[in-house]
């Protein structure tokens, strides 16, 4: 039996005026990670509040913690970091509701 996928939630601190720089760096990282084994999906969210501490929040789904760790340990990923402070962790879904 395969374990449930894990969810990466990554909140980014992006100063005013640096949104385009952030988006370009995030897209480079996303393009690489999307080619890695175990990658399932990602969604980037932008805050509606201009005063939010975290202007962007990425929610990605990976097949396993090991797949995520392997992908982010690749030299290609380390060579092109997203140059903004971030707060990331892997999560398990404990409840889901949908209409």
Show where each model-derived region lies:
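Glycine-rich beta-strand-turn "strand-cap" elements at beta-sheet edges
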Residues: 1-6, 43-54, 79-99
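Short, well-ordered beta-strand segments in beta-rich or mixed alpha/beta enzyme
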Residues: 5-13, 43-73
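Juxtamembrane helix-loop transition sites at the ends of transmembrane segments
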Residues: 32, 58-59, 64, 82-87
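Short amphipathic alpha-helical segments
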Residues: 16-41, 76-81
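Short, isolated positions within intrinsically disordered regulatory regions of eukaryotic proteins
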Residues: 22, 30, 66-68, 95
């Amino acid at each position: 039996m395969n374990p449930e996928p894990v969810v990466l939630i990554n909140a980014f601190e992006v100063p005013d005026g640096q949104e385009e720089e952030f988006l370009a760096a995030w897209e480079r990282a996303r393009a690489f990670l999307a080619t890695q084994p175990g990658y399932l999906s990602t969604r980037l969210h932008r805050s509606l509040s201009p005063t939010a501490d975290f202007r962007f929040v990425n929610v990605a789904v990976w097949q396993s913690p090991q797949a995520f760790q392997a992908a982010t340990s690749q030299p290609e990923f380390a060579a092109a970091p997203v140059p903004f402070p971030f707060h990331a962790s892997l999560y398990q879904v404990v409840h889901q509701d949908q209409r």
